Amino acid sequence: MRWAFLYGYAGYGAGAARNQGEQAMEAFRNVHLFDEGGPVLIFGGPYSNLQATQAMRAEAQRRGIPSERCICTGDVVAYCGNPAETVAEIRDWGCAVVAGNCERQLASGAQDCGCGFEEGTTCDLLSAGWFSFASAALDQDARNWMMELPDSISFGRGESAPDCFCIHGGLTDISRFLWSCSPQAEFDEELRELATRSGKGTPNYVFAGHSGIPFDRRIGDVRWINAGVIGMPPNDGRQTGRFVVLDQGKVEVFDLAFDHIGARAAMEQAGLTQGYHRGLTSGFWPSEDVLPPELRRDVKAG
């Protein structure tokens, strides 16, 4: 595992600096994993969902994809009922992890998730409950591990000009929500920031997370792929998470079935009954505040 340190960047951009409790980062940190071909499994948002994390690990093993070729786009800890156990499972598995906003916030001892929710929205209000539960459940060793996670992960084609980069939300803002319908200018801004920070030009692929809904969009010569998350359904009425596999230039999105009944029970046992527990079994989020209008259910149904 090769670490590349690029100095001169204090934080993740103005919006992220606010979200991350004014935490200053002395360097942009990228880890370059490998150059060899072969399948790569990429997933996001375990979200403290131990059942989904165990299912993802088992699926990688079933596919014969070793841990060093499995990459998480961050937010190991979030809404669900087993934050400490999920961190332990991810660490034991040994997959690579990009720092998400939740990891940055928990590592710094912040009082909120820094998710980028607008103040006063349902998502913002609900986050207070699950974030305080998660923070209380994690020991200092887990926080130290989170503190060491990189800002991005690259692989393929050589460290000097990687073929693929994995990030969380954005590089201008770790909590930036980018959707399939977001203006191209927002993606262009992120690609410029990636080129500036990495100093390695433009990759062929960017894999991201944070927003929770997978998509594959071409931005000029770059394919921007949101890998989805495994810890919560993508608001489509099904009780499965999502992940992607890149193999020989082909990207496929797959469903991940997990014990959603058990995951909901763990949330209920923890007292996390503000709505996300129902989302595990209904397949729908408790609020669509964060979604752009065209992705909300009432619009899509019409």
Name each model-derived stretch.
Residues Y47-Q51, A78-G81, C102-S108, T172-I174, ...:
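Active-site environment of divalent metal-dependent phosphoester hydrolases
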Residues D92-F155, A161-D163, D173, C181-T202:
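Active-site neighborhood of divalent metal-dependent phosphoester bond hydrolases
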Residues F43-G44, R69-D75, V97-N101, I167, ...:
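Active-site neighborhood of phospho(di)ester-bond hydrolases with catalytic His/Asp-centered motifs
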